[in-house]
Amino acid sequence: MRYKFKTQEDLVNHLKSVGFVFANSEIYNGLANAWDYGPLGVLLKNNLKNLWWKEFVTKQKNIVGLDSAIILNPLVWKASGHLDNFSDPLIDCKSCKTRYRADKLIESFNKDIHIAENSTNEEFMKVLNDHKIFCPTCKQFNWTDIRHFNLMFKTHQGVIEDPKNIVYLRPETAQGIFVNFKNVQRSMRLHLPFGIAQIGKSFRNEITPGNFIFRTREFEQMEIEFFLKEEIAYDVFDKYLNQIQNWLVTCCGLDLNNLRKHEHPKEELSHYSKKTIDFEYNFLHGFSELYGIAYRTNYDLSVHMNLSKKDLTYFDEETKQKYIPHVIEPSVGVERLLYAILTEATFIEKLANDEDRILMNLKYDLAPYKIAVMPLVNKLKEKAEAVYNKILDLNISVTFDNSGSIGKRYRRQDAIGTIYCITIDYDSFGDEHDPTFTIRERNTMAQKRIKLSELSLYLSQKAHEDFQKQCQK
C-alpha cells in the first residue's frame, strides 16, 4: 500500500533531510522563499535539463540552441513592453497588513471569475466589492487601493548609479532569443520552420512568492521560440501539445490523471498571444500552471524591428516573399517541473512486515544515482570499492554506501530514488577479474545475482522492459 505525503511541509522536510534542497542562507535565518540545491538536487536538476534538451532539441532536425546574457540593453524591455506593462496589481489588507496580488486573490476566491490581464485597478476593485472578497488571513474586508508594482529587478551597470546606467535582470529568456533571431538564422543558414531553444535563469520580483519552489524570485526556464509561416501555426501548436503531454507522462513520470489542460479565454490572454494552453499539475496546493504553450504571432519580432529599425524579416526563397515569422512558444520552469516530479514520485509504502519505507519512484534518466554499491560488511569495503571504481568507468552515476546495516542502506537509497543497490558479499570474488554480486531493484526489491561483465546488458534490458510497460499503459 502506498500513500502520498499529507502536506507540502512533510515533503519539503524529507527533501531537505536527504540533500535535495536547503533553505537559502540558513545560518542567517534564511531569505524568504529562496532555496539552494544540494548534491542530489543538482544531479536531479541537471538530469531533467538534459532530458528536456535531448527530447526537444537533440532529437529534432530543426532546433538549435542559444545562451543569451541575463542583462540586456534596456531598450529590449522597452520594445517588449516589460518596462511599461510587466507589473502585478498589489493590494494590502489594512487590518492584518498581509499583501496580495489582486488577480490571484480573486482567483483563489473563485476560479470561474475571469479577469483580463490588462484590467484596470478600478475593475479589480469592482470585482472585490461586488463579490465581497474578504482577506483570507484575518477575514476582514478592509483593503488599500490597488497599485501596480513592476516585477523587474533594477540595477546599475558601471561604477556610478546614474539613471543612464540603469539595467535590469531579465524577467524571461524569450527576448534574448528574439533579438538574436537574425544572427542565428544567418549563421546557421536556417530555413523556416525552425526553433531556437534556451535554458537559463530569469528573475521576477514577485509580490507573493511561495509554495516551496513553485514560485520563486530566481528561477530557470526551458523554452523554445519556434519560427514559422502563419499558415501552419495551429498545426505546430497542436504538435507541441501532444509531444509535451507524452514527454511529461513517459519521460518525467507524471500521472496523466494529475494533469489537465487549461485554455486561456480571450480576456485572459497576454497582449502578445493569440492562443495559450497551459498544462496544469495537481500539486499539493492544488492544480496550478506547469507547462505553457503560446502562439505569440509575430508580435515580438515586429516590436523589436520597429524600435531598433533593424530588418528582422525572413526571405522565403520558394515564394520570393519577405515577411515577419510567427512564433509558437513552449515554455516550462525547471523548478516548477522539478517540484511536480518530486511530488509525483515520492510516497510512503507500507511493506508486508508492517514496516514503512519512503520510496522515490524516479525514472531511470532522472534518478540522481542509478546504482549504489554496498559492502555486506565493513571488511569487504576494499573489494566493494574496486567494483565501485569499475562501475564509474562505465560512465554510470553511482554512489558508495557503507554506513549502517544493509537494511538501513537499502531504505536510504530507496528514499532518494536510487534505482539499483549492488551488494558485495563473501561470494563475490570467486573470479577476481569478473566479480559477481546481488543487484536489488528499487521498486520491487527483487534481487538477482549477476556478473560485473553482465551489468551493462542487464541495465539495458531493464530499461527496455520499463519502456514496454509504459507503452502498454
Curated annotation (Swiss-Prot):
The keyword Glycosyltransferase does not apply. Belongs to the class-II aminoacyl-tRNA synthetase family. It is an enzyme of class 6 (ligase). HAMAP family: Gly_tRNA_synth_B. Its EC number is 6.1.1.14. Catalyzes the attachment of glycine to tRNA(Gly). Substrate binds at residues 101, 172, 219-223, 329-333. The lineage of its organism: Bacteria, Bacillati, Mycoplasmatota, Mycoplasmoidales, Mycoplasmoidaceae. Keywords: Aminoacyl-tRNA synthetase, ATP-binding, Cytoplasm, Ligase, Nucleotide-binding, Protein biosynthesis. The keyword Transmembrane helix does not apply. This is Glycine--tRNA ligase. Its main location: cytoplasm. GO terms for molecular function: ATP binding; glycine-tRNA ligase activity; protein dimerization activity. One of its GO terms (cellular component) is cytoplasm. GO terms for biological process: glycyl-tRNA aminoacylation. It catalyses: tRNA(Gly) + glycine + ATP = glycyl-tRNA(Gly) + AMP + diphosphate. Homodimer. ATP binds at residues 204-206, 214-219, 289-290, 333-336. The gene is glyQS. InterPro entries: aa-tRNA-synt_IIb, aa-tRNA-synth_II, aa-tRNA-synth_II/BPL/LPL, Anticodon-bd, Anticodon-bd_dom_sf, Gly-tRNA_synthase/POLG2, Gly_tRNA_ligase_bac, GlyRS-like_core. It is found in: Cytoplasm.
